[in-house]
From Swiss-Prot:
Its cofactor is [4Fe-4S] cluster. Substrate binds at residues 256, 285, 314, 350, 370-372, 411-414, 450, 477. The keyword Iron-sulfur applies. It comes from Shewanella oneidensis (strain ATCC 700550 / JCM 31522 / CIP 106686 / LMG 19005 / NCIMB 14063 / MR-1). The gene is thiC. Keywords: 4Fe-4S, Iron, Iron-sulfur, Lyase, Metal-binding, S-adenosyl-L-methionine, Thiamine biosynthesis, Zinc. Catalyzes the synthesis of the hydroxymethylpyrimidine phosphate (HMP-P) moiety of thiamine from aminoimidazole ribotide (AIR) in a radical S-adenosyl-L-methionine (SAM)-dependent reaction. Gene3D superfamilies: 6.10.250.620, Radical SAM ThiC family, central domain. This is Phosphomethylpyrimidine synthase.
Amino acid sequence: MSSLESSSESIAVNILGQTNRRVARAQAQAFIDTLKPLQHPNSQKLYLQGSRADLRVGMRQILQTDTRIGGRAAAPNVEKNPPIPVYDCAGPYSDPAAQINVRQGLAKLRLPWIIERQDTEVLDCTTSDFTQQRLKDDGLDHLRFEAGSSAIIRPRRALPGKRVSQLHYARQGIITPEMEYVAIRENMALADVQDEILNRRGQGESFGAVIGKPITPEFVRDEIARGRAIIPLNINHPEAEPMTIGRNFLVKVNANIGNSAVTSSIEEEVEKLVWSTRWGADTVMDLSTGRYIHETREWIIRNSPVPIGTVPIYQALEKVNGVAEHLTWEVFRDTLIEQAEQGVDYFTIHAGVLLRYVPMTAKRVTGIVSRGGSIMAKWCLSHHQENFLYTHFREICELCVAYDVSLSLGDGMRPGSIADANDEAQFAELETLGELVNIAWEYDVQTIIEGPGHIPMQLIKENMDKQLIHCAEAPFYTLGPQITDIAPGYDHFTSGIGAAMIAWYGCAMLCYVTPKEHLGLPNKQDVKQGLIAYKIAAHAADIAKGHPGAQIRDNALSKARFEFRWEDQYNLGLDPDTARAYHDESLPQESAKVAHFCSMCGPKFCSMKITQDVRDYAASLEADAKAQSLAAETDGALAPLGSVQQVKSGHSELSHIDAELNYIAVKTQDELTAAMAQKSAEFAALGAKLYLPLDNANAANELAKHKDGAKLQSKTQVAKV
């Protein structure tokens, strides 16, 4: 190819890329302009009332259809199925009664609670030099909230000498409204579900976690006070709904969003925020590295019902034009203040990347893969000084506790391939993070620990065990881990497996991985795919740990599946839209919505349908046996039943009947064959049709009796196979 051809092709690709970005931005703008609350199919927003009028905990309940247990089509006998309550991260975005206006931001849910504690002050203006510079730039006005918007708030800070963290309050024995909110939210109203089938569950294995106790406000306070859980809520983010991260609570999932220098816009990031909460993101990290980081973050925070995290070193690096060697503590400190006053709820700080650890990575296959870790490693080597995040860590803590910003101690030495897993550099940093968490606790700063990464399955538990030992049970927050490196494009699978395992062992929050991991910046659909994969992993871990009520949704869906309640199957799932679409690909007819089979096995080989028929056959024999028993009591004689010998009277008769019924329930192969032959005859007698008109339903019920006297049971207008 000539240089001219190469240049032309490059120009064409660039034009196409710009066109695609314009289209994406326009679509995101349209999404924001028309944004209305959106609920999942057949779901309702539910609010549980706390101890005070302004403490209403939002969640979702999935409504179910009735189960038909007999009767005629025109007058069926039904069994009511209860609504299933589920955790909801979407805040007002899933409430049809909410008035959504992205340009006004969300309601300040927690502001009254913050004000009444009387330990904060409203600042006259921001104290960050960078923020003041941005506000003076009129050229950025088009990126800001309009003057007078309710989204604009003046920043708050702790009064001199005060600490305003949830950890500080917990250690004082104070149960805050945030703690009560969390307790109600974690219980999810599952105590109201009394159905025996829905509450079935196996014995969990919690690996030392305190699972099974009622989640009371006092339990939440105690976990926070011990440092085993956090409630990441900046006093400047009153829009956020309280949630907790800790291994004795439900496993949480974080979603990453953020623009870069080459793609995405503010509109797209706000769209991804709303999209993330719809699909279950418990927290969102804004990892923006491109232009307008400050303005993008402002729009995200003011419209976020979930905690927002950042990696401040990314923006600090932008301020020194991307040259790591030019970073200073002063630039970084101003960045912390800027973000804390905006309302960032937790900072990822790579303070454990020490100068002496950098040479430990020299023989790694993939070296240092953490972006923040590599930035600090380069700074340490270029200055041949200790990491300034480590040497200034106490100052970082003093700043964080003034806004209740939680710390997420970053794993800058995490392995980037399974070949590097559990090596010296990784565990050396982990020990340092344990040292730092104890310093943070001296200042009442809520803290979690970040973890790997790429770890083969057999080495995962060692990571959890060492973290608990070195970090005094501070919550663990991991990226996966990815358990194999052979599947680019499918790393939400390879990491989801590891995520489920480490969450079962005790990890408190999982950072999602999308199909674009290692390949590019995720779009909306990638975000959804990553979240669904990780919600599966988190939920599977909750079940394995033995969380009370965690399995209720599974049992409800299984019951719906067995009863061929197709709509309930879709709606009880994590992604109703996809489930419905997959079913309709092969069976699009409306009649298929009530069919007692799917396209996998077809009408003649559905195991669940066959099982139902066998149950009906056994039930008919049981009914006949009971009738004979009653007749025997009246006439003084007992009609023969199978091979059961006739007995004279009373309890002896009933015990023999029970023994025979137990035998029927077990079923020999011959009896199963006979039962299927009978159903085959019934099917043929009805004209071998899969579906019967509604006006023929009664006629079907009156079908001629077969040799054994069993009647055709027609639970629906769909003919039994």
